[in-house]
Amino acid sequence: MKICLIDETGAGDGALSVLASRWGLEHDEDNLMALVLTPEHLELRKRDEPKLGGIFVDFVGGTMAHRRKFGGGRGEAVAKAVGIKGDYLPDVVDATAGLGRDAFVLASVGCRVRMLERNPVVAALLDDGLARGYADAEIGGWLQERLQLIHASSLTALTDITPRPQVVYLDPMFPHKQKSALVKKEMRVFQSLVGPDLDADGLLEPARLLATKRVVVKRPDYAPPLANVATPNAVVTKGHRFDIYAGTPV
């Protein structure tokens, strides 16, 4: 995959070249999307909109730390949707990991989560965030136990993941209604990189065959159900709903 690669560390140790070969990235000087290695982290920038800033994965500080400490925990909609109750903490495959936010919330309340991400740039960002998270004194221990990354396409990986999870979680990209600043800067940068999930409808059936209990699909409230398969079961929040489908028991 072609992207502009920029090293701002000043270290001159070739770390960016190692990273590029690991994730199959090729430097393209004219690409509007840039993957930048800074002294702190790896980040994604949209070069024609510098005001948007860089996007990076941070499980240790910022909004994720706040959500972990002061968020709803088990009361969060995603936790309710996957079926967390009492001692039941399902094993989850997050088949559309993105920046790992929902996966992190589930891991922080005790679920084991395997994240699937097919885009190599997003996978590199996730891997960088995980490495910093794993090394953190406060969260590193449980994060290593509960949150892992698999760089693979969900369309193929969903058929051969073992052991089977109890829950498969899907949050495919859906075109935004607004073109304004209401669309978070992050989503704008993200959609420039990966585009809409045109094959997302193809994920529902393999997800239902893989999950032993349920499949949870996060949708904007205005979006039709995935693959146009309606379900009466959903956890509804302001702006989103989590559609719940039966899996395939062992």
From Swiss-Prot:
Keywords: Cytoplasm, Methyltransferase, rRNA processing, S-adenosyl-L-methionine, Transferase. Disulfide bonds: none annotated. It catalyses: guanosine(1516) in 16S rRNA + S-adenosyl-L-methionine = N(2)-methylguanosine(1516) in 16S rRNA + S-adenosyl-L-homocysteine + H(+). Pfam families: SAM_MT. It is found in: Cytoplasm. S-adenosyl-L-methionine binds at R101, D102, E117, R118, S153, S154, D171. GO terms for molecular function: rRNA (guanine-N2-)-methyltransferase activity. It is an enzyme of class 2 (transferase). Its EC number is 2.1.1.242. Transmembrane segments: none annotated. Its main location: cytoplasm. One of its GO terms (cellular component) is cytoplasm. It comes from the Bacteria. Specifically methylates the guanosine in position 1516 of 16S rRNA. Belongs to the methyltransferase superfamily. RsmJ family. HAMAP family: 16SrRNA_methyltr_J. PANTHER family: RIBOSOMAL RNA SMALL SUBUNIT METHYLTRANSFERASE J. NCBIfam families: PRK10742.1. This is Ribosomal RNA small subunit methyltransferase J. It comes from Escherichia fergusonii (strain ATCC 35469 / DSM 13698 / CCUG 18766 / IAM 14443 / JCM 21226 / LMG 7866 / NBRC 102419 / NCTC 12128 / CDC 0568-73).
